[in-house]
Amino acid sequence: MLMLFLTVAMVHIVALMSPGPDFFFVSQTAVSRSRKEAMMGVLGITCGVMVWAGIALLGLHLIIEKMAWLHTLIMVGGGLYLCWMGYQMLRGALKKEAVSAPAPQVELAKSGRSFLKGLLTNLANPKAIIYFGSVFSLFVGDNVGTTARWGIFALIIVETLAWFTVVASLFALPQMRRGYQRLAKWIDGFAGALFAGFGIHLIISR
């Protein structure tokens, strides 16, 4: 049983370390706003993971995969949201002026808004359900009891929270924030282009 938990932990940490919408959202929020705002986003992302992992654990992902119209709707909806996030970042990057003072800090978003953005960013990537469905199908067979199943679920949640806490803390360091202030326009533009790219990829790959 210990090997099962270690295997799932290794698979999930590799998946977490692969840069995606969640990573870029947390890092961009931490470096441009604050660690507190980024952590609220992390909590939102973690709640999103709870939803996807819970659906996979209960086997509901099989229903979604069989209902082609629902799967397409989720993919297109998620893609459009990521495109919208990318548009907002690109628009903000174009409006930024080359000033040394950290002007964006005056207009910090509400914590609830960062939480919601983190949650929606994660839920906007329906490929997560394919990932979690694969994990539970491969490693959680009929011989694995209910307690162990929910133990793996808890492991995934804790691991997600821990990883993105590290990301938020790293990108909120003063050195990182000073570097961001010098290159804010380019960093936000790059992040916006990535989000738009993720969104377009979801839509065309449905």
From Swiss-Prot:
Membrane topology reported for the UniProt record: Multi-pass membrane protein
Keywords: Cell inner membrane, Cell membrane, Membrane, Transmembrane, Transmembrane helix, Transport
GO MF entries: amino acid transmembrane transporter activity; threonine efflux transmembrane transporter activity
All ranges on the Cytoplasmic side of the membrane: 65-66, 174-206
Location (main, coarse): membrane
Compartments where found: Cell inner membrane
GO terms (BP aspect): amino acid transport; threonine transport
Record-level GO cellular component terms: plasma membrane
Periplasmic side: 22-43, 88-149
Pfam families: LysE
Transmembrane segments: 1-21, 44-64, 67-87, 150-173
InterPro entries for this protein: Homoserine/Threonine_efflux, LeuE-type
Family assignment from sequence similarity: Belongs to the Rht family.
Function: Conducts the efflux of threonine.
Name of the protein described by the UniProt record: Threonine efflux protein
UniProt organism field: Escherichia coli (strain K12)
